Amino acid sequence: MTRGDDAYAGRMPESLSALLRATAQQLADAGLTDPVVDAELLIGHVLGLGRGELQAAAIRGDRIEQADAERLAALAARRATREPLQHITGTAPFRQLELAVGPGVFIPRPETEMVVQMAIDALMESASPSPVAIDLGTGSGAIALAMATEVPRARVFAVERSPEAHAWAARNTVDAENLTLVLGDLATAFDELRGTASVVISNPPYVPASQIPSDPEVHLYDPVQALYGGEDGLDVIRVISRRAQELLHPGGMLVLEHAEHQGAAIRELLHADGWRSTATHEDLTRRDRATTALNR
């Protein structure tokens, strides 16, 4: 019997609260940092309940059907191997969105929600009746779709090089009438938009090649091309700096997500390329998370 089966050996827990405790313990034994949260999300996924509804049901002493408990056992065993929760449920929350995700696409992170807010603010402040926003390397489409849905007067364009990731982005953005998605290279995409964009934003690959992320969910499951940005992690950012200058109108804003230790190097890079008003911004954990600059 594998560790993944331990919580369900013998008689299944009869109550939802007992099953929640057993699942959380199984995930804690597997080394997960938030086992209770993951257990609640897995059980909620099986039962079709939100976390609040699930917690209320556990307090009431609700019981769970055997078939649902067995389905949960299989999903919890997968999570105990460090398969991403989002791959198991097939979805990832992002701001007001629920995105479809799975193998072949980078899972959107909560910290990116703050980064896209800067782009949304710039679009909302634009004097243009239909400002143009461009997402370079859109992955799942999270950033592009957030801009398109929260600033409906904007015209949003997104490019993704990976066919696998592009397929996920196409699924997520299919109903966004003000969003254009293309499969292609961010270095050459959208030539027809030169000099028109109010905002160019990217969450590019920025992990240095020698710094393999420690979390199995990241280094085993996130696409390699979405993680690594060359020896210093800045190879793709260098390309974006040059391309964004061509796409933005004078005074247009570039928004770049990056690792917490890269702000100074990126500001120096952007300054050398002729950008102005470069600034690095912290996320909610007080770590440097994004750098902005204005086109000359």
Model-flagged regions — what are they?
Residues 140, 150-296:
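S-adenosylmethionine
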Residues 1-55, 59-62:
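Non-catalytic accessory regions of SAM-dependent methyltransferases
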Residues 119-128, 246:
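Glycine-rich helix-loop-beta junction characteristic of Rossmann-like nucleotide cofactor-binding loops
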Residues 1-25, 124-132, 174-178, 192-194, ...:
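Short, low-complexity, intrinsically disordered N-terminal peptides in bacterial proteins
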Residues 129-137, 157:
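Conserved class I S-adenosyl-L-methionine
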Residues 36, 43-121:
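Conserved AdoMet
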